[in-house]
Amino acid sequence: YEHVQEVYVEQAYLKYKLNENANVLAGLMLVPMGIINEYHEPTTFYGVERPNVDAAIVPTTWRELGVGISGKIDNASLKYQAYLFNGFKSYAGGSGILRGSDGLRKGRQKGAESVVSSPNFSSKLDYYGIPGLRVGLSGYFGKTQTDDSSIEASTIGVAMIGFDARYKYNNLELRGQYINANLSDTEDYNTLT
């Protein structure tokens, strides 16, 4: 600890159980996108490094401050999550944070000193009705955050749609995910920064 200046907390939230199928959550939580961000411990993916999509597009470990609901609908075999989060930070102290070579990774706020100029919406549905199969559909929509909202070009729009599937049968395990990320207002942002 002699050279440590900060300590990061991965998750810290309160969860209130409304009933058997619904919870309200608030605090520092993982953004529900894809497979690896929610299940990111090294023993849960095959390889030394995280997949490229989970390093730059879904910048695991991606956690933000938020509030929302989670639960399940047993008769439909669905698990759901819906949250309002602070978004990626794109501009602070008079300079841009995001660069194309890093994807969205450097914009993660991780809870510490987070700026919220407009909340972002994130949700995920998981279907678990077939033994061994889990299929997920996730979405993330909003704008990046800035510490100076008077500079209009300091934010960009972020829209992500994700589809993931996992299947396990005996010793066979198959996984796949597809993430479509769209950024808007990038030309104005690049001109500014």
PLM features: what roles do these ranges have?
Residues Y127-T193:
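Detector for outer-membrane/organellar transmembrane beta-barrel domains
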Residues V4-Q11, E38-T43, A92-G100, T146-I156, ...:
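Outer-membrane beta-barrel translocator domains and adjoining extracellular loop/strand segments
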Residues N19, E49-V53, G93-G96, R108-K110, ...:
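Glycine-rich loops and low-complexity Gly/Arg-rich segments
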Residues E2-H3, M33, P51, G87-Y91, ...:
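Sequence/structural signature of outer-membrane beta-barrel proteins
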Residues M29, E41, A82-L84, I97, ...:
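Residue-level detector of alpha-helical recognition elements and their boundaries
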Residues Y1-S90, S117-S122, D126-R134:
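Outer membrane beta-barrel
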